[in-house]
Amino acid sequence: MSGRGKGGKGLGKGGAKRHRKILRDNIQGITKPAIRRLARRGGVKRISAMIYEETRGVLKSFLESVIRDAVTYTEHAKRKTVTSLDVVYALKRQGRTLYGFGG
């Protein structure tokens, strides 16, 4: 026994998480007020009703491309954990340099 408790390191150890809410479409987790707050930060005064779904779609495609690149860096380094540097390099590759997280 490794003393890890119920979770264990191997697959199939421990039961299901009891209080985990199942989100079928996670992009809906980006709520209308959250999009509104981001727009306010950008100086937007009024927002059309159709903007919310469009924003979710654009955000989803942007995050998919960044995460895909970050995972590629992680796999190349033969690691299983995506680090902040992987994300920084992925953003830099797409021409969106981010400062303050190393690299």
UniProtKB/Swiss-Prot annotation:
Q: Identify the Gene3D superfamilies for this entry.
A: Histone, subunit A
Keywords carried by this UniProt record: Acetylation, Chromosome, DNA-binding, Methylation, Nucleosome core, Nucleus
N6-acetyl-N6-methyllysine PTM positions read K6, K13
Domain of life (superkingdom): Eukaryota
Where are the compositionally biased (Gly residues) regions?
Answer: 1-14
Fetch the Pfam families from UniProt. CENP-T_C (PF15511)
**Record InterPro entries:** CENP-T/H4_C, Histone-fold, Histone_H4, Histone_H4_CS
Family per similarity comment: Belongs to the histone H4 family.
What is the protein name given in its UniProt record?
Answer: Histone H4.2
Organism, by scientific name, is: Emericella nidulans (strain FGSC A4 / ATCC 38163 / CBS 112.46 / NRRL 194 / M139) (Aspergillus nidulans)
